[in-house]
Curated annotation (Swiss-Prot):
EC number: 3.2.1.52
Organism field: Shewanella sp. (strain ANA-3)
Record key words, sorted: Cell cycle, Cell division, Cell shape, Cell wall biogenesis/degradation, Cytoplasm, Glycosidase, Hydrolase, Peptidoglycan synthesis
Gene from which the chain derives: nagZ
Protein name: Beta-hexosaminidase
Role according to the record: Plays a role in peptidoglycan recycling by cleaving the terminal beta-1,4-linked N-acetylglucosamine (GlcNAc) from peptide-linked peptidoglycan fragments, giving rise to free GlcNAc, anhydro-N-acetylmuramic acid and anhydro-N-acetylmuramic acid-linked peptides.
Active site: 177 (proton donor/acceptor), 249 (nucleophile)
Catalytic activity: Hydrolysis of terminal non-reducing N-acetyl-D-hexosamine residues in N-acetyl-beta-D-hexosaminides
Subcellular location field: Cytoplasm
């Protein structure tokens, strides 16, 4: 069935974690900085995971900028919000750079047998400090153009894209990791601004997955988007025509606590339309679900396996050493340009 994505405590898989990974409802694993000490160790960890569950979807938040879990042995990817300024506002150059950075981010993960980065961020850069330069821009048309190029670079490496945080996290100050953000704007502002990157990239067929925000938009619906059948079934599926995988954001975040304990949160997310739920940084929470939750009898309509890499494309990309090297130099060039401004 495979509705659950969980995490690990440290640099290898404990016997208790191995038992959890064997559970039929576990279909995904997300890695964090605590699971990484070196590229060699990471490769060994992934091999250990694959021996236990060969088909499991292995993911990471590896957007670039301050959200990059693996650093030593990996290229430091610039923050998405630094691309257009580094190109001095030239969108033609910025799009080319975004494509190469998407390729670079993806190929360095795929080379370690990691399937997926939860990227890119499609939020607009507004008042949210937790988003900030994780966003490509404050303007929807710039987010769309740059994200499209970044996603195309990912695809050229063989990796699918997961857009987040639907329908937009940029206009709330609160951080949903530690608080319950509420976006008090009228529906018109959200539909005419924030939702546009999701809408257009879905129409282009660029998004394999979407992660909704743990944000309440009370002028639209009383529930956080990730627990809202209106947002996920009516808007995302029906009106926008999205047919990829919907991942919940981490159900351990404060913004998810409105739905009660983990059993309540999981039920709310699945009822709303999520295909895979994430529970991070809380092993007892994971165990409560594996032991006490009544999972759906049928498999997800949009299984997370849809996000597995295009192996043939990845094999070709891995042989393109010159593109990889040129992209690394580009990333360093943008980083240096940004440091010179500080």
């Amino acid at each position: 069935m495979s509705y659950l994505m969980l995490d690990l405590l440290s640099l290898d898989v404990s016997e208790a974690e191995a038992e959890m990974l064997r559970h039929p409802q576990v279909g995904g694993l997300i890695l964090f900085s605590r699971n990484f000490s070196s590229r060699e160790q990471l490769i060994a960890l992934v091999q250990q995971i694959r021996q236990i569950r060969p088909e499991i979807l292995i993911a990471v938040d590896h957007e670039g900028g301050r959200v990059q879990r693996f650093r030593e042995g990996f290229t430091l990817i610039p923050a998405m919000g630094d691309i257009l300024p580094a190109a001095k506002g030239d969108m033609v150059i910025a799009k080319r750079w975004a494509c190469e950075l998407g390729f670079l981010m993806a190929i360095e993960l795929l080379a370690c047998d990691i399937d997926l980065s939860f990227a890119p961020v499609l939020d607009l850069n507004g008042i949210s400090q937790v988003i900030g330069k994780r966003s490509f821009s404050a303007k929807p048309e710039e987010v769309i153009a740059l994200a499209q190029s970044f996603i195309e670079g990912m695809a050229e490496a063989g990796m699918g894209a997961v857009g987040k945080h639907f329908p937009g996290h940029g206009s709330v100050a609160a951080d949903s990791h530690i608080a319950q953000p509420i976006d008090e704007r009228e529906a018109e502002a959200i539909f005419n601004q924030d939702i546009l990157p999701f809408k257009d990239l879905i129409a282009m067929g660029k998004l394999s997955g979407i992660m909704p925000a743990h944000v309440i938009y009370p002028k639209v619906d009383p529930n956080p988007a990730g627990f809202s059948s209106y947002w996920l079934k009516q808007i995302l599926r029906k009106e926008l025509g999205f047919n990829g995988v919907i991942f919940s954001d981490d159900l351990g975040m404060k913004g998810a606590s409105i739905a009660g304990d983990y059993l309540g949160r999981a039920q709310a997310a699945l009822d709303a339309g999520c295909d895979m739920i994430l529970v991070c940084n809380d092993n007892p929470g994971v165990m409560s679900l594996l032991n006490g939750f009544v999972w759906p009898a049928s498999a997800p309509q949009h299984p997370a396996s849809l996000l597995k890499p295009n192996a043939a494309q990845t094999a070709i990309a891995l042989e393109n050493a010159s593109r990889w090297e040129n992209a690394k130099q580009l990333a360093e060039q943008i980083q240096l340009a940004q440091q010179a401004k500080v």
